[in-house]
Amino acid sequence: KAVFDAYWGKWAEYRSSVGLVLSSHLQTQVALAKARHYENVLERELFQDNLPPAVYRTLVTEVNKALPTLHRYFKLRQRMLGLDQMHYYDIYPPLVALDKKFDIETTKAITLDAMEVLGDDWVKIQRDSFDERWMHVFPQQGKRSGAYMSGFAYDVHPYLLLNHNDDYESLSTFAHEWGHAIHTLYARQSQPFETANYATFIAEIPSTSLELILQNYMVNQAETIDEKLFYLGFGLEQMRGTFFRQTMFAEFELALYEAVERGEALSGDRITQMYGEIVRRYHGHDEGVVIVDDLYTNEWMFVPHFYFNMYVFQYATSVTAGTALYGKILEDQEAGSANYKDLLRAGGSDYPHLLLSRAGVDLTQPEPYQAVVTQMNAIMDQMERLLEERDQ
């Protein structure tokens, strides 16, 4: 609480200035969309990849319908942390501590074992790639933080930047970035230069799929109840942060553009009010699920993606598609993995929505989003059973 109050309290001092900057950006984008004869900014931003607006709007609609599942997660979190009342700052502490280290060699071995569900050819490509020294693995002075895969050169293999810290998050990040890398390899091997590069809308799907495969593997390999709870809780938190939080941002961003398109003038105070209404609805503030104090409604100022024009929704659609494709692998490992790899090999050979539809995932329809919600509820059912077993 002290950290949140100090951090967002300082941001609040700049609300008027940051509001002016964001409002100016929004007005510019609306003017550019009108000048180019688009109906609105959403239509303009989806045009390049020929994405139906129904993808964006169905995502927002289905996630709003699923808010009771998000609230169930918060109540489970409250129970596991032993809190009388959840506040916004209680979302981030880990549910269970894991005293386990994953050095880089262990990380490689676990990843190869977990990815056996994708077939021998996948494992061979990944194992051979490990031996080619494509990765800069460890943190060092002057190195940027985070993790990144670079695969821009058609005739050159991908490079991976990592900052491995021997923890489970580093292991999950390792799998994530190799999802990008092998996607790039498959696309380069199967497509000519002109159609090898894939759209952002597709890019995060392989990475999120590999995280799901890893998580399921780790749960099955866990030796204690607390270890299982850690992996399940880690996966739930990723779903919250990607499926719900990014959709919340997407809904907020759409509301901002629609307000400007109606001719409304947006100040820092008005933007904060709009964000506050959405963040409180998502977190069940009025129902007492998670209390979001006024100060924390300044959070919108912290998010750089609001200057990227309708970008964040793709994180949520990616985890949705990744969950659907992984579900097909679980149903029929051979056919599901072949279908998955066919999508990766397709690169940018067609519009991303059409490629996904051919892989059996139609994101204009409610079913893929509902499958994510079903998966979250199944994880929480499993966690509640484990908690009862542990507490006996």
Task: Kindly label every feature range from the protein language model.
Residues H37, N165-Y186, S207, L212, ...:
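Active-site recognition of the HExxH zinc-binding catalytic motif
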Residues N50, R79-Y89, F174, S209-L212, ...:
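C-terminal, non-catalytic "cap/extension" segments appended to globular domains
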Residues K1-Y159, L387:
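Contiguous, non-catalytic segments that form substrate-binding/exosite surfaces or channel walls
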Residues V3, Y7-K10, L59-E62, A66, ...:
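Amphipathic alpha-helix face/heptad-repeat signature
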Residues D113, V117-K124, S150, H180, ...:
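Conserved helix-loop functional segments at active or binding sites
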Residues K34, P52-V55, D103, Q140, ...:
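Secondary-structure capping and boundary motifs in well-ordered enzyme cores
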Residues Y38-E43, Q85-H87, G146-H157, E177-Q189, ...:
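Active-site-adjacent bridging/hinge elements
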Residues L70, F74, Q78, A199-Q215, ...:
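Conserved catalytic alpha/beta cores of large enzymes that bind or transform nucleotide phosphates
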